[in-house]
Each structure stands twice: as C-alpha cells, then as structure tokens.
Amino acid sequence: MQLKVALDWTPNVIHAGLYVAQIENLWKDSGLEVEYISVEIDNYQKKTTQRLAEGEVHIALSPSEHLLDYRLLRETTAPIKAIATVMQQETSAFVTLPDSGITRPTQLDGKTYGGYRTQLERELLTSLIQQDGGKGDISLVTPPRLDVFDAFLQRQFEVCWVFLPWEGVIAEQMGLPLNAFHLHDFHIPYGYSPILMAQEAVLAQEEEAFQIFLQAVARGYRQAAEQPEETAKLLVEHLDHPNFQDLAFITRAMQVIAPSFLNGQQQWGVMQAERWNAYVQWLDEHHLLKRHDGTHLSADQLSTAPLYTNNLLGIF
C-alpha cells in the first residue's frame, strides 16, 4: 500500500522522526510505500485536514483544533480521528522582538498580530492578554501563511505565533532573543499539536498498514529524541530541501525539540484524555465550541473519546 502523508508545514525538525523512518526504510519488507506532501505544493492554500477529508491523502498533520473543526463542527461524510501526537510538550509561543519593549502579554493591547488564518489563534492571543490583565484589544493582519515570520522580522506587526525549535532558533542565530509568551504559563490549556489524523473508514480498511507506519515512525522519533545531533547529520545528508542545508542550524533545532518528542515512559505518540478534556473544556468556557449550524455545543455534550486512539501505536 502507498500511504500519502500531508505535512502541516514545510519540512522541518517537527518531522524528524517521519524522515528518519523514511531514510532508514524502517517499514521495509512490509510492502508499504510512503510519500510526504508539503504545504509548498500550493503555498498552503488548502489545509491538510481538507486534503484528508477529500481523500487526497491517508494521513494529515495538523493542530487539534483542525480535527475538532472537521470532526464535530462541519457536516462531513468522512469523520477523522487522531492516531498519534508528534510532541508531548507545547513548543509554540506568541513572540515579540527584543527591541519592541513588549515583555508581557498585557502590553500587546492596541498592537497588531500577524496571523495564519487558522482557527482559534486570535482567541488564544486575546485570552493570553486578558490572563495577564489586559483587554485583549488587538488588530489582525494575515500575510501569506509561509511568509508570516519574515514579515514579523521586517516589523510589519508586533507579535506572531511561532514554533520555537525552528523560528526561535532562526531568531537566536540572528542575535534576536525573542520575548516568548507560552500559553501554559498563563493557565491556558492547548491541545496536542501537531497530531496525525486519518479517516475512520480508511483506518478500518487498512489498519495493519497504519500500524506498520506508526510503529516505524515511533522508532524514528525515539532515535531523534535520543540522538539529536546524529539525527541532524542524517537529515542534512539525505534531505534535498532548502530547510535542511545548514548543519549547525539543524543541530541546534534538534537539540531544542528533542526533549518534546517522548512522554515520561519514553513513548512516542501517546495522547491523554486529561489533555483533550481540558482543551475542550476551555473551548466551551470561551464559547468556541459550535456546531456546523452555529449553535453552541457544550463540553458536557462532547465526548473526547471518539476523537483519538492510541491503539495503533503498538504499546498497549
């Protein structure tokens, strides 16, 4: 079987375990062929969840809120389910430049946020500001998704949401230590991101192929977590992509991200009900859970159990 996997962004160290599995052919002798599809194919005009729901790919990487959107809030004949999480820890943050004078979220009132046109980003930032004592009064601009960080560095707006083991390392190597505001520091629960998702119907038909893929990828991520420097060398040597040309940069990025891949039991991919429930409860409290017709959906009406499974990871 050929599995097509839609990446959530251009290739980067989030995808390290995926590429380790491919480079080392960890699914050899299984008959499985795997193709990774980057958002670059259309400059991120179509979300990965849309590609998944429309049957273009078998697996999609995306934040948890995209799954909620397609699974619960839209009329869809192709329900999707999370089958693994890439990271256990939150690795993103809202950031400002060191010379901006903005060192706390409350100082973002009246400022401009450069966004990605995705669910919840404005609501999360507003809540972050309010949790720090501000009003949450921000303006929003939306450059092309793949250009947001460059526009931020050009000071077209004061704040953006970045992945610290990538954009954070870029800024670090430019001598720009970013002011980073983490959601968890302000008691805002955020879902797993990114997660791997698949259509339930396809999972039922091809369960063995998904198990082979996920268990190989888990080996790749364990290797990346335990040997970040060696993994960096492997990626730079084998990946013909502009993002993987600078060994010093990739090594530093791998060192930053490696502690986030595994849980306390040294397992990759496992999701916990408590985190899903806390996230959905927060969405309910902020009136962000809505059905496709716009009516409110409460956390009490939503069981998170059907949203995800750990059963394909081969560790239970």
Give the positions of each predicted feature.
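Positions that flank functional sites
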Residues: I41-D42, L67, E167, F186, ...
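Short Gly/Pro-enriched turn/cap motifs at secondary-structure boundaries
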Residues: D8-W9, H187, M271-Q272
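Conserved C-terminal helix/tail region of periplasmic/extracytoplasmic solute-binding proteins
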Residues: N277-F316
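Secondary-structure end/capping motifs
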Residues: E206-H286
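Solvent-exposed, polar/charged alpha-helical surfaces in well-ordered, non-transmembrane soluble domains
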Residues: Q50, T106, E123-T126, D150, ...
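Pocket-lining segment of extracytoplasmic ligand-binding domains
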Residues: A151, Q156-N243
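Short, surface-exposed acidic
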Residues: K135-L140, H241-A253, L289-L302
